[in-house]
Swiss-Prot record:
Coiled coil: none annotated. The keyword Repeat applies. A lipid is attached at C30 (S-diacylglycerol cysteine). The gene is vlpE. It is a lipid-anchor. This is Variant surface antigen E. It comes from Mesomycoplasma hyorhinis. GO terms for cellular component: plasma membrane. Residues 93-243 have a biased composition (Polar residues). It is found in: Cell membrane. A lipid is attached at C30 (N-palmitoyl cysteine). Residues 97-239 are annotated as: 11 X 13 AA tandem repeats. Sequence repeats lie at residues 97-109, 110-122, 123-135, 136-148, 149-161, 162-174, 175-187, 188-200, 201-213, 214-226, 227-239.
Length: 243
């Protein structure tokens, strides 16, 4: 009986010693675990680099990468990317080409650097922004209504084909009449008598002669229809001369 009691006491004391010896080991292991956790949670400092590209429509695309070094010896790496937008030319309504000088120019094909309000649809008119010439620019007379060729001297000339530099109100449709702007001669110009009603030939001496075919240089009131009567202006001889 005494031996069994003694052996039980030895086992109990040995077990307590083992337990007491295990407590510091458990404490040490717990302390190491806590220390490792605290080291992994510490913030670190790092360096990074990035690059970006700018596109024509105003969007900015960038990307970057970096490496973070913590105090516990742990290395972390990562990458980041971002998008942004910017507007450089907002007010220019030019659809195809940019107009650096006049943002309100409505020219759809080519820029007009001098006159932003020019309504010329094909070519720019640098001198006269209000010119209504549809094909060619008229640098001298902005209100000229000549549709084919510019008339630099007479902006109100109504000559449809050729310009009349001297008489802006001449109604000559084919040729210009430089001397008599009111001449109604339809085919040829009458330089001396602007009121002559001779339809085919000019009558240089008698502006009121009503001779339809030939001119009557001496008697302006002769009513001879075919031949001229140089001596008797009031003779009514229709075929022969009355001397």
């Amino acid at each position: 009986m005494k031996k069994s009691i003694f052996s039980k006491k030895l086992l109990v004391s040995f077990g307590s010693l083992v337990t007491l010896a295990a407590i510091p080991l458990i404490a040490i292991s717990c302390g190491q675990t806590t220390d490792n956790l605290s080291q992994s949670q510490q913030p670190g400092s790092g360096t990074g680099s990035g690059s970006g590209t700018n596109t024509e429509n105003g969007s900015n695309n960038g990307s970057g990468s970096g490496t973070t070094n913590s105090s516990g010896g742990t290395n972390q790496s990562g990458s980041a990317s971002g998008n942004g937008s910017s507007n450089s030319s907002v007010s220019t309504p030019d659809g195809q080409h940019s107009n650096p000088s006049n943002p309100t120019t409505s020219d759809p094909k080519e820029s007009n650097p001098s006159n932003p309000t020019t309504s010329d649809p094909k070519e720019s008119n640098p001198s006269n922004p209000t010119t209504s010439d549809g094909q060619h620019s008229n640098p001298s007379n902005p209100t000229t209504s000549d549709p084919k060729e510019s008339n630099p001297s007479n902006p109100t000339t109504s000559d449809g084909q050729h310009s009349n530099p001297s008489n802006p109100t001449t109604s000559d449709g084919q040729h210009s009449n430089p001397s008599n702007p009111t001449t109604s001669d339809g085919q040829h110009s009458n330089p001396s008598n602007p009121t002559t009603s001779d339809g085919q030939h000019s009558n240089p001496s008698n502006p009121t002669t009503s001779d339809g075919q030939h001119s009557n240089p001496s008697n302006p009131t002769t009513s001879d229809g075919q031949h001229s009567n140089p001596s008797n202006p009031t003779t009514s001889d229709g075929q022969n001369q009355n001397k």
